[in-house]
Amino acid sequence: GSAIARELMRKKRNIAVLERCSDICEGTSKANSGIVHAGFDATPGTLKAKMNVQGSRMMEALSKELDFFYKRNGSLVLCFNEADRPKLELLLEKAEKNGVEGCEIISGDEVRQMEPQVSEQVVAALYAPAGGIVCPF
């Protein structure tokens, strides 16, 4: 709500943000894990796909402007057997349709070079360098 209000105020709109509880963020609609999604999993052509990609692209500049922690650390979707590799290929296809840049399918060995503690059972992964994290608190 506050990010939407901020953007509307920049367009000279009169805005009020109302909180349901006695303190801010007590009435969140679901949860906040601090993940900035790259947008590879959203159904192509949906508003969610558009907003995931656009929001991810905006986050670095916004974090500098508003002075909050943000790290573009990328994300991995792990594949533990060859039978599941088509699922990675489907995610890669969605990523391309959604305009997520830099996604690729990498080998299990490449995953372990990035994250040495990853299980030896991992055979491949979708790597999305646009994924990131923020501190939600």
Where are these regions (language model features)?
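Dinucleotide-binding Rossmann-like beta1-alpha1 core, especially the glycine-rich loop
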Residues: G34-M114
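Residues forming the Rossmann-fold NAD(P)(H) cofactor-binding site
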Residues: S2
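Short, conserved glycine- and acidic-residue-centered signature motifs
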Residues: S29, N52, C135-P136
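Helix-loop-beta segment of a Rossmann-like dinucleotide-binding subdomain
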Residues: F69-L78, R112-F137
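Glycine-rich FAD pyrophosphate-binding loop
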Residues: M9-A31
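Proline-centered flexible-loop/turn and helix-kink motifs
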Residues: K11-R13, K64, P116
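Structural motif
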Residues: I15-A16, G34, A124-A125
